[in-house]
């Protein structure tokens, strides 16, 4: 082998090794996936963890109640069982906050699924993946059993959704979103929430209820949750 060819081969091998090490083992963006065993330091909330090294992990496929919302304490207490335990973390991506996005396995069980099964979260996903159907089935089971956030109020059935309009003209935040409900019961003291973190507390009197919104309802279609003052489900559009 000529000397020049020999050195070209060496350079190629070194470059390929560096590329493999960098892309396959460190990148967590796009379609890159990796599995690692990590120690959980603490549960920040029901769907966010701090792991060894100070990194944060956001559990994919679920959305648990935020602090001060109904069942927020139950959700975080459920997730606290991961503290000081070594788990298998399957990373799919990293979000804009620098959090690892992924799925957690403890004792060979998908923890994201366990939260849904117990009714401490609802299914929430920007993009379908290999676990989506599994998570949807877990959520359906909790809904049928009326566990956690799915436990129904005695006033469930009082409200009928007549309209949930988003801003169709593409101009965001112009107060053209509209929610219209029909209440066949007495005045209801409720909390209204969308698929994200928008929540408000209102009184819905008997009869027609209408309200305009801005920058709230998802243009691609949104969920609507309504709970009574004790945290029981009054209405859902899901």
Explain the meaning of each model-derived region.
Residues 1-238:
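Small beta-barrel nucleic-acid-binding modules, primarily SNase/OB-fold domains
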